[in-house]
Each structure stands twice: as C-alpha cells, then as structure tokens.
C-alpha cells in the first residue's frame, strides 16, 4: 500500500492521563535524585479532587509524596476548582509497597556482576525511525505533538486567555508512493472558558495554534479543520475523565506508525526494560536511518525476567534497506550491547531526566538529556556496512 491516509494523535500536558504520567515521572525523578539505584514503579490515578499514588518502590530516599503531585498539577495549570481541579485543595492518597523479593533477586547484582543485571520483567519492545522529518520521526505524530505543545505555550503566555489545560490533537496525512504528500485533516479539541464565543475560539486555534506550527507546503488545498467538533469543551482534565499512568502509550511513541510491545514508560526506573529497552531500540533504529542504511527501520528486542541477554532481536526496513535486514541485525549485534545494565550505562539513564519525557512524546525531541536521540553510531554503522 503506497497511497493512503494515516492519522496520529497527541494530547496536552493537561490531559488527565498525561497529568498522571507527569506525576509518576516526577516521583521517579525525585527518588533518583537521592538514590540512583532505587527500584520504582509508581502508578497514579487522578479524578475529581483526588490523586492516588500506588505501586512498588524500594529506596532509601526521603521524598514528599504529597507536595510533588501538587507541584506538578500547579505547574500544568490546574489551580482552581473553577476549571475542574485545584492543586491546593485536592486530596492525595498513597499506597506503596516494596519491590517483590522474587523480582529483585533476578535484577540486583553485585558490583562485579552488574553488567549481567537481569531484565526486570519479560517482554518485547520496539524502536522506530524514518526519514519523514529531520528528527527521524513519522510526520503525523511529530506534528500532533507540536500542536498541543503550541496550545500549552499560548495558554501559559496568556496570548489566548480562554484556553484551559486539557487538549487533544489529531493529524491525518496523505501518503503517495510511501512518502508524506500533504496534511488533509487537523482535529483540535481544547478545553476553554465558558464565555469565549465559538467564532473567536475557532479562529484563534486555526491562526495561533495550527498555522504557526504546520509547514505551509504540507497543507492540502482542501484541508479540513475540525475545532472542538462537539461545540463545547468546558469540563475537562481530571474532572472530565479519570486519568491513569500509562494509558497513552501510542502517543508516547510513534503514533501508531510502528508496533508497540504494550509496556508503558512513566513512573518506571530504567531497570524496567519496558522503558530502557524501548529507548535503546529507538537509539538503534535512529542510527540505522541516520547512517543512510534504510529510510525506515523498526527494531524489536525481547527479554526474559532475570536474564541479561535479549532472547531475540529483529530488524525490519520495509523494503527501504541498503543491505538485507538479516545483515542489519548482525551489524546491530556487533555495535550495540542491549543488556539492561549496558543500556543504562550507554544512555546514562540513572539521572532524574524523566519528567520532560512525560508529555509531548518520548522520542523525536531535541533535549540534551534525551540520550537515546543521539546519532553518534551512524558513521561506524555506515563504515561497517561498507556503503
């Protein structure tokens, strides 16, 4: 299929599921700041007037489980019951256990054995890259993120004073011969104050949110803008929908362009391969594309709990590879150590860097702390491939 429409969506930092993700990663960062080798699996639920924290945490760190969620909610912009959630008055409940000793015995290693640290669970993870954008990301998800990011900037700056924190975007792109041709449909649903006229809202979103973000040459002559299609979006955030950590895994990754192994990222320390191996797989795939070895590359890696070495590695280039996929897999095995501790070491993952990942995508962003986005292996791969 070379001619088709493909759609991806994103959500803003004020979407209830993203509120939960950001709280979980803020807890993780606060713990890693004091205890880099902590074991953290922090789950968050947020609903009307309530935040619940649960999961498994083993650490010597002392953190304020009450203040951190309130700080995140306040930073997002939920500061009044008038908009559905108030950082100062919401209740915060906690219910944490320690990591199971049955899991810990497969993950914990002495200093001499640390490179053989086992995976924290079984599972399969995917990484993907393509040449549709300079960031080597699929175009639909890349621009879906930028739209809700722009909505948040305009809201926080006060330029569009009627914007409120909760928002969603959706971008439909027409592909011809496998390449993105133009953007056919944009959907933006944004929470707003009750008194803004609809005409003002629609014009503001199109002119201030959409047009400054999307490249003019990509807009179809008959592009369709669907702005708040229900006509009203006043009740939003945790008051409108219950938010849960890990419920936006496609938004977090490639917008549906690539496969997903099912494991969420936020609230998990890097001993959990759901997170660290997915980051490593992106690192591998991005370097393959950056090296010019393929236009599209998807990497699957799989693990058994307590075992360091991956049980499988697969590469697909969807007919765009300069060398056979099997040869690429051999190339990856020579140049990348995908044992969990090696990933943590190579990508420097024991730092409190995860808060920034929790909204607007874990991939395709030019943040210095996003080490999985570097392309430092591209030249070595190209040389070894002999092209």
From Swiss-Prot:
Residues that hold K(+) according to the record: 43
GO cellular component, one term: cytoplasm
Region Flexible loop, residue ranges: 99-109
Role: Catalyzes the formation of S-adenosylmethionine (AdoMet) from methionine and ATP. The overall synthetic reaction is composed of two sequential steps, AdoMet formation and the subsequent tripolyphosphate hydrolysis which occurs prior to release of AdoMet from the enzyme.
Binding locations of Mg(2+): 17
Chief place of localization: cytoplasm
Domain of life: Bacteria
Localization of this protein: Cytoplasm
Top enzyme class: transferase
Protein name listed in UniProt: S-adenosylmethionine synthase
Gene3D superfamilies registered for this protein in UniProt: 3.30.300.10
Catalytic activity from the UniProt record: L-methionine + ATP + H2O = S-adenosyl-L-methionine + phosphate + diphosphate
Entry similarity comment: Belongs to the AdoMet synthase family.
Binding site residues for ATP: 15, 166-168, 232-233, 241, 247-248, 264, 268
GO biological process: one-carbon metabolic process; S-adenosylmethionine biosynthetic process
